[in-house]
């Protein structure tokens, strides 16, 4: 398992350095997507702590769909957040679903990669 955070835990390794535990075939999930587990409650109730998300890498410069949920990778973190347009064109706003968390104004230059969240799988509800 590898985790992304919904709350701001420090990044310890990149996806490429992780070992693949296996493969799954889930109806409605793109077979090219990667499944990762979410730790933290900043995206609750949309993405609860312990849920799995199917993510697919996209290009930051051309593929942002404002208001959609992404995994944002920086040098220090990989976070699940809703990306919103910022008044400063050099930044994006990272928004949490949980109102207990403040928005983060993130310089685009600090973002190393983004992955769109395609599906949320909450195993506790299965």
Regions found by a protein language model. Give the residues of each.
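Short, positionally conserved secondary-structure boundary motifs
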Residues: 1-49, 59-62, 123-126
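Conserved binding/catalytic microenvironments
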Residues: 21-22, 29, 88-90, 110
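Small-residue-enriched segments and motifs
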Residues: 36, 78-81, 115
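A generic structural signal for residues embedded in beta-strands
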Residues: 55-56, 72
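Short peripheral tails and domain-boundary helices/loops at the edges of structured domains
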Residues: 71-92
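Amphipathic alpha-helical interface segments
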Residues: 91-126
């Amino acid at each position: 398992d590898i985790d992304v955070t919904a709350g701001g835990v420090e990044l310890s390794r990149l996806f490429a350095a992780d070992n693949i535990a296996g493969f799954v075939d889930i109806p409605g999930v793109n077979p090219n997507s990667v499944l990762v587990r979410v730790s933290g409650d900043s995206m609750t109730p949309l993405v609860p702590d312990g849920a799995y998300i199917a993510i697919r890498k996209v290009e930051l410069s051309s593929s942002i769909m404002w208001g959609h949920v992404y995994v944002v990778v920086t040098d220090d973190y990989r976070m699940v957040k809703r990306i919103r347009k910022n008044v400063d064109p050099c930044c994006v706003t990272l928004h949490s679903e949980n109102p207990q968390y403040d928005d983060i104004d993130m310089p685009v230059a600090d973002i190393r990669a983004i992955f769109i969240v395609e599906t949320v799988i909450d195993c506790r509800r299965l």
